């Protein structure tokens, strides 16, 4: 393949720039029970970057990609399904791939952006404190 790049290891500071050069970003996890309950940090990173995601994983990570409309998710370790999904993304118009990336970015901003997470956490703490005050 001449249009696939695996850039290797780089300092974290340069990663956003490298990731933004990609048309599609790949995240994979092995098919293990423990991995079904986890969301790889790459999923959140890729959403923040605003690029379509091609995910080969099961469970929460796959559900998140699908729920966000941020790309395509295939079962972990299913090479045929991964190849089909890659072709499907390749055949999309650039505008459609951009839409998938934008969906992921919006989902990230709504669900994972730090200041919003802090605000939600503080809201939960306030509810907890208020509910215990009313019990006294």
Sequence positions of predicted segments:
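Conserved acidic donor-binding segment of nucleotide-sugar-dependent glycosyltransferases
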Residues: 67-68, 72-79, 88-94
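Nucleotide-activated donor-binding/catalytic signature segment of Leloir-type glycosyltransferases, i.e.
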Residues: 1-17
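Acidic donor-binding loop of glycosyltransferase active sites
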Residues: 19-36, 51
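Short acidic/histidine- and often glycine-rich active-site loop of Leloir-type glycosyltransferases
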Residues: 37, 58-68, 73
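Short alpha-helical segment that forms part of, or immediately flanks, the ligand-binding pocket
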Residues: 13-16, 20, 40-49, 59-63
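C-terminal alpha-helical cap of glycosyltransferases
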Residues: 114-136
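Conserved donor-binding/catalytic loop of nucleotide-activated donor transferases
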Residues: 20-23, 44-52, 68, 74
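A short, well-ordered alpha-helix in the C-terminal region of glycosyltransferases
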Residues: 81, 88, 95-110
């Amino acid at each position: 393949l001449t249009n696939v790049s695996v850039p290797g290891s780089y300092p974290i500071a340069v990663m956003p720039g490298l990731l933004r050069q990609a048309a599609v970003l790949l995240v994979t996890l092995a098919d293990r029970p423990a991995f079904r309950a986890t969301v790889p940090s790459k999923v959140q990173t890729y959403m923040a970057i605003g690029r379509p995601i091609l995910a080969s994983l099961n469970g929460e990570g796959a559900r998140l990609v699908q729920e966000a409309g941020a790309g395509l998710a295939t079962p972990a370790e299913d090479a045929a399904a991964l190849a089909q999904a890659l072709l499907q993304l390749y055949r999309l118009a650039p505008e459609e791939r951009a839409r998938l990336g934008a969906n992921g970015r919006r989902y990230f901003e709504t669900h994972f952006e730090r200041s919003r997470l802090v605000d939600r956490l503080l809201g939960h703490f306030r509810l907890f404190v208020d509910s215990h005050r009313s019990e006294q």
